[in-house]
Structures are given as structure tokens and as C-alpha cells.
Amino acid sequence: MARIAGTFSGRGFNIETIAVNVTDDPKISKIILTTWGNQDTIIKIEKQLHRIVDVLQVDDLTGRESVKREMALVRVKMTEEQKPELMQIIDTHKWKVVSSGADYCIMEVTGDKEEIEIALAVLKPFGMDDFSRTGAVALAKKNNNVRG
């Protein structure tokens, strides 16, 4: 992963999000990253990644039918007076409460990038105390021989 990140930073390419997970082969990790650029930039990125010996495959999902999701854990300060309204909002948006106490609520929010941004904006007025957010994970709707 360090060589991949180094390839990006050394060439002036930007990584917007990065997520790493295991595959069915414990010797292989899948790195899903989000970047941006025009078509020439994306082609250059792909060529640079293919030069890294340990890279087995590079798939550009641009223009392909795919599912992309992010996840955020959001902690909100909560008073007894706010609780009914907050629970209604959580229920309406189908967010999941993963922990709560007398003065806080931690929820799990999943969706695309825009849905996460909306959730953070909706929760900010409640006294959003902190949040942690994953990078995007993605899968093409049709298999293109992607490992794991």
C-alpha cells in the first residue's frame, strides 16, 4: 500500500479516498481508491500502478455500472428533549444507532458520498460531537475478473 500511495504522491496525483480489505486469498489485499482527473490523467495513473510489481490488476470503474458506498460513525450530543426528534430523523433516514447513553448517540450512516454529506449536515445542528468516515468501497455490477 505504501508503494501505491507513494506512486500517487510522487507523481502529483491526488487520492480522495482509500480503503483496503482482504480477499479470499490471504496473500492478496484489495485496495479501492477514489481519485479524479481527465481521461489522460486516469490512463497515466493506471500505467503507473501497473508498473508496481505487486499490483495484479487495475480496474477503472468510471462509466461502468457499479455500486459505491461509504460508511460514517457519527457521535451527537443528545439531551432528553432532543431525543424524540433525533430518533425520528434516524428512523426516517434508516440510519442505525450503534451506541447511546444519557447524553449521546452514535449512529452508523451508509450510502454514497452525497448521502454521507447530507447526514453530516442534518446532524450538525444537533451538536455533532465527532465523526469517523471510511473511504469509498465499490463493486462493478458485472464481474470483470476482479480478484476477491
Predicted ranges, named:
Residues M1-S29, T34-G148:
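Long, contiguous binding/interaction regions
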